[in-house]
Protein backbone atom coordinates (compact mmCIF):
# COMPACT_ATOMS: atom_id res chain seq x y z
CA UNK A 1 0.00 0.00 0.00
CA UNK A 2 1.65 3.21 -1.20
CA UNK A 3 -0.05 6.04 0.67
CA UNK A 4 2.79 8.44 -0.20
CA UNK A 5 2.33 8.25 -3.97
CA UNK A 6 2.82 11.63 -5.62
CA UNK A 7 1.22 13.51 -8.50
CA UNK A 8 3.46 14.87 -11.22
CA UNK A 9 3.61 18.58 -11.90
CA UNK A 10 2.89 17.91 -15.60
CA UNK A 11 -0.42 16.16 -14.79
CA UNK A 12 -1.53 19.05 -12.56
CA UNK A 13 -0.67 21.63 -15.21
CA UNK A 14 -2.60 19.56 -17.78
CA UNK A 15 -5.66 19.55 -15.49
CA UNK A 16 -5.38 23.32 -15.09
CA UNK A 17 -5.23 23.80 -18.87
CA UNK A 18 -8.31 21.61 -19.42
CA UNK A 19 -10.47 23.83 -17.24
CA UNK A 20 -14.06 22.96 -16.45
CA UNK A 21 -14.25 26.13 -14.36
CA UNK A 22 -14.58 29.53 -16.04
CA UNK A 23 -11.53 31.90 -15.83
CA UNK A 24 -12.82 35.44 -15.11
CA UNK A 25 -10.65 36.71 -12.22
CA UNK A 26 -7.98 39.40 -12.72
CA UNK A 27 -5.33 40.68 -10.30
CA UNK A 28 -7.55 43.39 -8.78
CA UNK A 29 -10.43 40.92 -8.39
CA UNK A 30 -8.06 38.62 -6.49
CA UNK A 31 -6.83 41.47 -4.27
CA UNK A 32 -10.41 42.40 -3.41
CA UNK A 33 -11.22 38.72 -2.86
CA UNK A 34 -8.27 38.43 -0.46
CA UNK A 35 -9.15 41.63 1.38
CA UNK A 36 -12.73 40.35 1.60
CA UNK A 37 -11.48 37.18 3.30
CA UNK A 38 -8.91 38.80 5.61
CA UNK A 39 -10.51 42.06 6.72
CA UNK A 40 -13.60 40.73 8.41
CA UNK A 41 -14.35 39.57 11.90
CA UNK A 42 -10.63 39.98 12.65
CA UNK A 43 -10.56 43.74 12.35
CA UNK A 44 -14.15 44.26 13.48
CA UNK A 45 -14.06 41.94 16.50
CA UNK A 46 -10.57 40.71 17.42
CA UNK A 47 -8.69 44.02 17.40
CA UNK A 48 -10.50 45.20 20.53
CA UNK A 49 -10.06 41.92 22.40
CA UNK A 50 -6.38 41.65 21.44
CA UNK A 51 -5.79 45.26 22.51
CA UNK A 52 -7.28 44.45 25.91
CA UNK A 53 -4.79 41.54 26.23
CA UNK A 54 -1.60 43.24 25.06
CA UNK A 55 -2.31 46.95 25.53
CA UNK A 56 -0.87 49.41 22.99
CA UNK A 57 1.84 46.81 22.31
CA UNK A 58 -0.82 44.95 20.32
CA UNK A 59 0.72 46.56 17.23
CA UNK A 60 3.68 44.20 17.77
CA UNK A 61 1.25 41.27 18.07
CA UNK A 62 -0.07 42.12 14.62
CA UNK A 63 3.47 42.62 13.32
CA UNK A 64 4.58 39.19 14.60
CA UNK A 65 1.52 37.37 13.23
CA UNK A 66 1.70 39.47 10.07
CA UNK A 67 5.41 38.74 9.57
CA UNK A 68 4.82 34.99 9.83
CA UNK A 69 1.91 35.23 7.40
CA UNK A 70 3.82 37.51 5.00
CA UNK A 71 6.68 35.00 4.84
CA UNK A 72 4.16 32.22 4.19
CA UNK A 73 2.48 34.47 1.60
CA UNK A 74 5.77 34.69 -0.32
CA UNK A 75 5.91 30.88 -0.33
CA UNK A 76 2.29 30.68 -1.49
CA UNK A 77 3.09 33.21 -4.22
CA UNK A 78 5.95 31.08 -5.57
CA UNK A 79 4.01 27.81 -5.47
CA UNK A 80 0.85 29.39 -6.92
CA UNK A 81 2.86 30.83 -9.80
CA UNK A 82 4.49 27.42 -10.38
CA UNK A 83 1.40 25.21 -10.00
CA UNK A 84 -1.76 27.27 -10.60
CA UNK A 85 -4.28 24.82 -9.14
CA UNK A 86 -7.46 25.34 -7.10
CA UNK A 87 -6.16 22.71 -4.68
CA UNK A 88 -3.69 25.20 -3.20
CA UNK A 89 -1.90 23.66 -0.16
CA UNK A 90 -3.39 20.23 -0.88
CA UNK A 91 -1.96 20.17 -4.41
CA UNK A 92 1.48 21.46 -3.38
CA UNK A 93 1.75 18.68 -0.78
CA UNK A 94 0.48 16.06 -3.25
CA UNK A 95 3.47 16.83 -5.45
CA UNK A 96 6.13 17.22 -2.75
CA UNK A 97 5.20 14.94 0.18
CA UNK A 98 2.58 12.44 -0.96
CA UNK A 99 -1.10 11.60 -1.15
CA UNK A 100 -2.00 10.82 2.46
CA UNK A 101 -0.39 13.98 3.85
CA UNK A 102 -1.99 16.09 1.11
CA UNK A 103 -5.38 14.51 1.76
CA UNK A 104 -5.08 14.96 5.54
CA UNK A 105 -4.25 18.67 5.31
CA UNK A 106 -6.92 19.14 2.62
CA UNK A 107 -9.47 17.49 4.92
CA UNK A 108 -8.42 19.72 7.82
CA UNK A 109 -8.57 22.85 5.65
CA UNK A 110 -12.10 22.02 4.47
CA UNK A 111 -13.17 21.85 8.11
CA UNK A 112 -11.24 25.02 8.88
CA UNK A 113 -12.81 27.02 6.04
CA UNK A 114 -16.33 25.84 6.92
CA UNK A 115 -15.88 26.63 10.62
CA UNK A 116 -14.38 30.04 9.84
CA UNK A 117 -17.30 30.88 7.54
CA UNK A 118 -19.75 29.77 10.25
CA UNK A 119 -17.91 31.84 12.87
CA UNK A 120 -17.99 34.94 10.66
CA UNK A 121 -21.71 34.30 10.06
CA UNK A 122 -22.23 34.34 13.82
CA UNK A 123 -20.39 37.65 14.03
CA UNK A 124 -22.53 39.01 11.18
CA UNK A 125 -25.69 37.98 13.03
CA UNK A 126 -24.60 39.92 16.13
CA UNK A 127 -23.88 43.10 14.14
CA UNK A 128 -27.13 42.70 12.18
CA UNK A 129 -29.23 42.32 15.33
CA UNK A 130 -27.49 45.32 16.91
CA UNK A 131 -28.03 47.42 13.77
CA UNK A 132 -31.76 46.60 13.67
CA UNK A 133 -32.05 47.39 17.38
CA UNK A 134 -30.53 50.81 16.68
CA UNK A 135 -33.27 51.37 14.11
CA UNK A 136 -35.94 50.41 16.63
CA UNK A 137 -36.48 46.91 15.22
CA UNK A 138 -36.08 44.20 17.83
CA UNK A 139 -35.56 40.59 16.73
CA UNK A 140 -36.93 38.27 19.45
CA UNK A 141 -33.92 36.86 21.27
CA UNK A 142 -34.95 33.24 20.69
CA UNK A 143 -34.43 33.73 16.92
CA UNK A 144 -30.70 34.27 17.32
CA UNK A 145 -30.13 32.08 20.39
CA UNK A 146 -28.90 28.49 20.11
CA UNK A 147 -31.26 25.63 21.08
CA UNK A 148 -28.92 24.69 23.94
CA UNK A 149 -29.63 28.12 25.45
CA UNK A 150 -33.40 27.91 24.93
CA UNK A 151 -33.70 29.50 21.48
CA UNK A 152 -34.68 28.31 18.01
CA UNK A 153 -31.19 28.74 16.57
CA UNK A 154 -29.25 31.57 14.98
CA UNK A 155 -31.76 32.18 12.19
CA UNK A 156 -30.10 35.34 10.73
CA UNK A 157 -26.80 33.42 10.40
CA UNK A 158 -28.55 30.56 8.58
CA UNK A 159 -30.30 32.94 6.18
CA UNK A 160 -27.16 34.91 5.29
CA UNK A 161 -25.12 31.74 4.64
CA UNK A 162 -27.83 30.32 2.35
CA UNK A 163 -28.11 33.66 0.53
CA UNK A 164 -24.37 33.74 -0.10
CA UNK A 165 -24.44 30.09 -1.21
CA UNK A 166 -27.11 31.04 -3.75
CA UNK A 167 -24.87 33.85 -5.05
CA UNK A 168 -21.93 31.43 -5.36
CA UNK A 169 -24.12 28.95 -7.26
CA UNK A 170 -24.61 31.58 -9.98
CA UNK A 171 -20.93 31.55 -10.95
CA UNK A 172 -17.80 33.62 -10.36
CA UNK A 173 -18.97 36.58 -12.46
CA UNK A 174 -21.96 37.17 -10.17
CA UNK A 175 -20.15 36.38 -6.92
CA UNK A 176 -17.15 38.50 -8.00
CA UNK A 177 -19.32 41.61 -8.49
CA UNK A 178 -21.12 41.12 -5.16
CA UNK A 179 -17.82 40.48 -3.35
CA UNK A 180 -16.16 43.59 -4.82
CA UNK A 181 -19.07 45.78 -3.69
CA UNK A 182 -19.01 44.30 -0.18
CA UNK A 183 -15.24 44.75 0.09
CA UNK A 184 -15.57 48.39 -0.99
CA UNK A 185 -18.05 48.93 1.86
CA UNK A 186 -15.79 47.13 4.33
CA UNK A 187 -12.65 49.08 3.41
CA UNK A 188 -14.70 52.28 3.44
CA UNK A 189 -15.74 51.86 7.08
CA UNK A 190 -12.20 51.00 8.17
CA UNK A 191 -10.85 54.14 6.48
CA UNK A 192 -13.72 56.17 7.98
CA UNK A 193 -12.86 54.88 11.47
CA UNK A 194 -9.18 55.76 11.06
CA UNK A 195 -9.84 59.23 9.62
CA UNK A 196 -12.41 60.17 12.29
CA UNK A 197 -10.67 58.45 15.21
CA UNK A 198 -7.21 59.94 14.63
CA UNK A 199 -8.47 63.38 15.76
CA UNK A 200 -9.32 61.94 19.20
CA UNK A 201 -6.01 60.17 19.84
CA UNK A 202 -4.34 60.89 23.20
CA UNK A 203 -0.63 59.89 22.96
CA UNK A 204 -0.53 59.30 26.73
CA UNK A 205 -2.80 56.27 26.17
CA UNK A 206 0.10 54.73 24.23
CA UNK A 207 2.89 55.64 26.64
CA UNK A 208 1.14 54.75 29.90
CA UNK A 209 1.48 51.00 30.47
CA UNK A 210 2.51 50.25 26.88
CA UNK A 211 2.86 46.47 27.39
CA UNK A 212 0.91 45.63 30.58
CA UNK A 213 1.32 41.85 30.21
CA UNK A 214 4.87 41.94 28.87
CA UNK A 215 6.16 39.79 26.03
CA UNK A 216 3.92 36.86 26.97
CA UNK A 217 0.87 39.10 26.53
CA UNK A 218 2.12 40.22 23.13
CA UNK A 219 2.61 36.58 22.02
CA UNK A 220 -0.77 35.51 23.39
CA UNK A 221 -2.40 38.34 21.46
CA UNK A 222 -0.37 37.35 18.37
CA UNK A 223 -1.92 33.88 18.51
CA UNK A 224 -5.36 35.47 18.93
CA UNK A 225 -4.98 37.87 16.01
CA UNK A 226 -3.62 35.15 13.74
CA UNK A 227 -7.29 34.46 12.96
CA UNK A 228 -7.40 38.00 11.57
CA UNK A 229 -4.97 37.02 8.79
CA UNK A 230 -6.77 33.88 7.67
CA UNK A 231 -7.85 34.23 4.07
CA UNK A 232 -4.81 35.19 2.01
CA UNK A 233 -4.27 31.52 1.22
CA UNK A 234 -7.80 31.43 -0.19
CA UNK A 235 -6.54 33.52 -3.11
CA UNK A 236 -4.55 30.58 -4.46
CA UNK A 237 -7.68 28.38 -4.49
CA UNK A 238 -9.01 30.56 -7.33
CA UNK A 239 -6.11 29.63 -9.64
CA UNK A 240 -8.24 27.80 -12.21
CA UNK A 241 -10.68 30.72 -12.44
CA UNK A 242 -7.91 33.30 -12.87
CA UNK A 243 -6.72 34.88 -16.10
CA UNK A 244 -2.91 34.53 -16.38
CA UNK A 245 -2.58 32.97 -12.89
CA UNK A 246 1.24 32.71 -13.00
CA UNK A 247 1.50 36.51 -12.75
CA UNK A 248 -1.82 37.48 -11.16
CA UNK A 249 -1.67 35.16 -8.12
CA UNK A 250 1.69 36.22 -6.62
CA UNK A 251 0.93 39.91 -7.21
CA UNK A 252 -2.48 39.61 -5.55
CA UNK A 253 -1.19 37.65 -2.54
CA UNK A 254 1.61 40.12 -1.77
CA UNK A 255 -0.51 43.26 -2.33
CA UNK A 256 -3.30 41.84 -0.15
CA UNK A 257 -0.97 41.08 2.77
CA UNK A 258 0.68 44.52 2.68
CA UNK A 259 -2.65 46.37 2.52
CA UNK A 260 -4.27 44.31 5.30
CA UNK A 261 -1.28 44.51 7.67
CA UNK A 262 -1.20 48.31 7.25
CA UNK A 263 -4.93 48.54 7.99
CA UNK A 264 -4.63 46.37 11.12
CA UNK A 265 -1.78 48.40 12.59
CA UNK A 266 -3.49 51.74 11.90
CA UNK A 267 -6.75 50.53 13.46
CA UNK A 268 -4.92 49.29 16.58
CA UNK A 269 -3.04 52.57 16.94
CA UNK A 270 -6.29 54.54 16.78
CA UNK A 271 -8.13 52.14 19.13
CA UNK A 272 -5.47 52.23 21.83
CA UNK A 273 -4.84 55.94 21.31
CA UNK A 274 -8.45 57.02 21.77
CA UNK A 275 -9.49 54.74 24.66
CA UNK A 276 -7.44 53.07 27.40
CA UNK A 277 -6.63 49.50 26.42
CA UNK A 278 -8.39 47.91 29.42
CA UNK A 279 -11.76 49.14 28.15
CA UNK A 280 -11.44 47.54 24.71
CA UNK A 281 -12.46 43.94 25.47
CA UNK A 282 -15.73 44.32 23.55
CA UNK A 283 -16.73 42.53 20.35
CA UNK A 284 -17.64 45.77 18.54
CA UNK A 285 -14.62 47.86 19.53
CA UNK A 286 -14.69 50.18 16.51
CA UNK A 287 -18.27 51.30 17.12
CA UNK A 288 -17.65 51.41 20.89
CA UNK A 289 -14.68 53.78 20.54
CA UNK A 290 -16.61 56.11 18.22
CA UNK A 291 -19.54 56.22 20.64
CA UNK A 292 -17.13 57.04 23.48
CA UNK A 293 -16.07 60.25 21.71
CA UNK A 294 -19.63 61.22 20.77
CA UNK A 295 -19.52 60.09 17.14
CA UNK A 296 -22.74 58.07 17.33
CA UNK A 297 -23.73 58.61 13.70
CA UNK A 298 -20.33 57.47 12.47
CA UNK A 299 -20.59 54.47 14.82
CA UNK A 300 -23.92 53.61 13.17
CA UNK A 301 -22.31 53.81 9.72
CA UNK A 302 -19.51 51.51 10.93
CA UNK A 303 -22.08 48.97 12.18
CA UNK A 304 -23.90 49.09 8.82
CA UNK A 305 -20.60 48.65 6.97
CA UNK A 306 -19.74 45.71 9.22
CA UNK A 307 -23.02 44.00 8.31
CA UNK A 308 -22.20 44.40 4.61
CA UNK A 309 -18.48 43.72 4.93
CA UNK A 310 -18.67 40.53 6.97
CA UNK A 311 -20.71 38.99 4.16
CA UNK A 312 -17.58 39.16 1.99
CA UNK A 313 -15.71 37.05 4.54
CA UNK A 314 -18.44 34.40 4.56
CA UNK A 315 -18.38 34.31 0.75
CA UNK A 316 -14.58 34.03 0.55
CA UNK A 317 -14.27 31.14 3.01
CA UNK A 318 -17.16 29.10 1.59
CA UNK A 319 -15.69 29.66 -1.89
CA UNK A 320 -12.23 28.47 -0.75
CA UNK A 321 -13.72 25.37 0.89
CA UNK A 322 -15.63 24.55 -2.30
CA UNK A 323 -12.54 24.87 -4.49
CA UNK A 324 -10.31 22.65 -2.34
CA UNK A 325 -13.05 20.01 -1.99
CA UNK A 326 -13.58 20.13 -5.78
CA UNK A 327 -9.90 19.46 -6.44
CA UNK A 328 -9.73 16.59 -3.93
CA UNK A 329 -12.84 15.02 -5.49
CA UNK A 330 -11.39 15.45 -8.99
CA UNK A 331 -8.43 13.34 -7.84
CA UNK A 332 -10.86 10.59 -6.80
CA UNK A 333 -10.31 11.01 -3.06
CA UNK A 334 -13.89 12.19 -2.49
CA UNK A 335 -17.06 11.20 -4.45
CA UNK A 336 -16.87 12.15 -8.14
CA UNK A 337 -20.41 13.58 -8.01
CA UNK A 338 -18.94 16.61 -6.23
CA UNK A 339 -17.12 17.63 -9.44
CA UNK A 340 -20.23 17.88 -11.65
CA UNK A 341 -20.72 21.47 -12.83
CA UNK A 342 -23.94 23.23 -13.87
CA UNK A 343 -24.57 25.60 -16.79
CA UNK A 344 -22.76 28.36 -14.89
CA UNK A 345 -19.66 26.13 -14.63
CA UNK A 346 -20.20 25.82 -10.88
CA UNK A 347 -20.08 22.49 -8.96
CA UNK A 348 -23.64 22.99 -7.73
CA UNK A 349 -24.02 19.84 -5.60
CA UNK A 350 -20.79 20.63 -3.78
CA UNK A 351 -21.62 24.33 -3.45
CA UNK A 352 -25.01 23.71 -1.86
CA UNK A 353 -23.73 20.81 0.25
CA UNK A 354 -20.96 22.89 1.80
CA UNK A 355 -23.24 25.92 2.11
CA UNK A 356 -25.95 23.97 3.95
CA UNK A 357 -23.34 22.40 6.26
CA UNK A 358 -21.98 25.88 7.07
CA UNK A 359 -25.51 27.18 7.71
CA UNK A 360 -26.29 24.31 10.10
CA UNK A 361 -23.05 24.85 12.04
CA UNK A 362 -23.65 28.61 12.25
CA UNK A 363 -27.28 28.17 13.25
CA UNK A 364 -27.33 25.34 15.73
CA UNK A 365 -23.91 24.56 17.21
CA UNK A 366 -21.95 26.51 19.83
CA UNK A 367 -18.77 26.93 17.77
CA UNK A 368 -16.67 28.29 20.65
CA UNK A 369 -13.38 26.42 20.72
CA UNK A 370 -14.24 24.62 17.48
CA UNK A 371 -13.42 27.85 15.67
CA UNK A 372 -9.84 27.56 16.99
CA UNK A 373 -9.51 24.53 14.70
CA UNK A 374 -9.30 27.01 11.82
CA UNK A 375 -6.26 28.60 13.48
CA UNK A 376 -4.46 25.28 13.99
CA UNK A 377 -5.34 24.05 10.49
CA UNK A 378 -4.05 27.23 8.88
CA UNK A 379 -0.87 27.46 10.98
CA UNK A 380 0.05 23.86 10.11
CA UNK A 381 -0.87 24.40 6.45
CA UNK A 382 1.22 27.57 6.24
CA UNK A 383 4.20 25.84 7.87
CA UNK A 384 3.89 22.92 5.43
CA UNK A 385 3.70 25.29 2.47
CA UNK A 386 6.90 26.97 3.68
CA UNK A 387 8.50 23.51 3.91
CA UNK A 388 7.18 22.57 0.46
CA UNK A 389 8.83 25.66 -1.03
CA UNK A 390 12.18 24.35 0.23
CA UNK A 391 11.41 20.88 -1.22
CA UNK A 392 10.60 22.44 -4.61
CA UNK A 393 13.80 24.48 -4.41
CA UNK A 394 15.81 21.26 -4.00
CA UNK A 395 13.83 18.83 -6.21
CA UNK A 396 12.74 21.12 -9.07
CA UNK A 397 15.44 23.81 -9.38
CA UNK A 398 14.83 24.38 -13.10
CA UNK A 399 11.03 24.45 -13.18
CA UNK A 400 9.46 27.65 -14.53
CA UNK A 401 8.41 30.00 -11.73
CA UNK A 402 6.45 33.21 -12.13
CA UNK A 403 7.80 34.38 -8.76
CA UNK A 404 10.71 33.31 -6.53
CA UNK A 405 10.96 33.63 -2.75
CA UNK A 406 13.98 35.84 -1.99
CA UNK A 407 16.64 34.54 0.38
CA UNK A 408 15.95 30.84 -0.14
CA UNK A 409 15.89 28.78 2.01
CA UNK A 410 16.31 31.20 4.94
CA UNK A 411 12.93 32.95 4.76
CA UNK A 412 10.84 29.74 4.63
CA UNK A 413 12.82 28.37 7.61
CA UNK A 414 12.13 31.56 9.61
CA UNK A 415 8.46 31.20 8.64
CA UNK A 416 8.36 27.61 9.96
CA UNK A 417 9.98 28.68 13.26
CA UNK A 418 7.46 31.52 13.73
CA UNK A 419 4.52 29.19 13.09
CA UNK A 420 5.99 26.70 15.56
CA UNK A 421 6.05 29.46 18.19
CA UNK A 422 2.38 30.24 17.49
CA UNK A 423 1.41 26.56 17.80
CA UNK A 424 3.10 26.40 21.20
CA UNK A 425 0.31 28.45 22.81
CA UNK A 426 -2.59 26.42 21.32
CA UNK A 427 -4.78 24.87 24.05
CA UNK A 428 -5.00 21.13 24.72
CA UNK A 429 -8.73 21.14 23.93
CA UNK A 430 -8.06 22.54 20.47
CA UNK A 431 -5.37 19.91 19.83
CA UNK A 432 -7.80 17.14 20.83
CA UNK A 433 -10.46 18.48 18.42
CA UNK A 434 -7.83 18.72 15.68
CA UNK A 435 -6.61 15.13 16.19
CA UNK A 436 -10.18 13.76 16.25
CA UNK A 437 -11.01 15.56 12.97
CA UNK A 438 -7.83 14.19 11.35
CA UNK A 439 -8.69 10.64 12.52
CA UNK A 440 -12.17 10.94 10.98
CA UNK A 441 -10.54 12.07 7.73
CA UNK A 442 -8.10 9.15 7.75
CA UNK A 443 -10.97 6.69 8.26
CA UNK A 444 -12.59 8.15 5.12
CA UNK A 445 -9.24 7.92 3.31
CA UNK A 446 -8.68 4.22 4.00
CA UNK A 447 -12.36 3.29 3.53
CA UNK A 448 -12.92 5.20 0.28
CA UNK A 449 -10.19 7.50 -0.97
CA UNK A 450 -7.22 5.14 -1.34
CA UNK A 451 -8.99 2.66 -3.62
CA UNK A 452 -10.72 5.39 -5.66
CA UNK A 453 -7.66 7.57 -6.17
CA UNK A 454 -6.85 8.44 -9.79
CA UNK A 455 -3.25 7.51 -8.96
CA UNK A 456 -2.83 3.74 -9.12
Identify the residue ranges that each predicted region occupies:
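Helix-loop-helix junctions that connect adjacent transmembrane segments
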Residues: 16-21, 58-59, 63, 135-157, ...
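Membrane-helix boundary/coupling elements in multi-pass transport proteins
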Residues: 44, 85, 108-126, 224, ...
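C-terminal membrane-solvent junction of multi-pass transporters and transport-like membrane proteins
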Residues: 149-152, 212, 337-347, 382-431, ...
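Extracellular loop-to-transmembrane helix junctions
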Residues: 22, 45-146, 256-259, 263-266, ...
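Membrane-interface "cap" regions at the ends of multi-pass membrane proteins
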Residues: 1-46, 52-56, 70-77, 83-86, ...
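Helix-loop-helix connectors at the membrane interface of multi-pass transporters/channels
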Residues: 94, 121-152, 189, 241-246, ...
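Membrane-interface loop-to-helix entry segments
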Residues: 125, 152-200, 212-215, 253, ...
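TM-loop-TM module centered on a large, flexible mid-protein loop between adjacent transmembrane helices
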Residues: 91-92, 98, 129-134, 221, ...
Amino acid sequence: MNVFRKKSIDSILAESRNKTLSPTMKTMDLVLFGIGAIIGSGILVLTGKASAEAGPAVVFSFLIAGLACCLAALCYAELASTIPSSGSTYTYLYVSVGEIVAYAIGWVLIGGYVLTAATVANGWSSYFSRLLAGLGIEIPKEYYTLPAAGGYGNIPAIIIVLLITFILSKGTSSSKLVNNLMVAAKVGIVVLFIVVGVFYVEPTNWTNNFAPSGFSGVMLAATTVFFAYLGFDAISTSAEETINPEKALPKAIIITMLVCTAFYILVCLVLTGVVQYNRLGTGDALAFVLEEVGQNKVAGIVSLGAVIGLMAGILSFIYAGIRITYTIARDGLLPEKLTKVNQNKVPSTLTWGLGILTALLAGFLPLGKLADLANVASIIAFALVSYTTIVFYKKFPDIKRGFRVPGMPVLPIISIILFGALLYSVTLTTWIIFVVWVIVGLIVYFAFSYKNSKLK
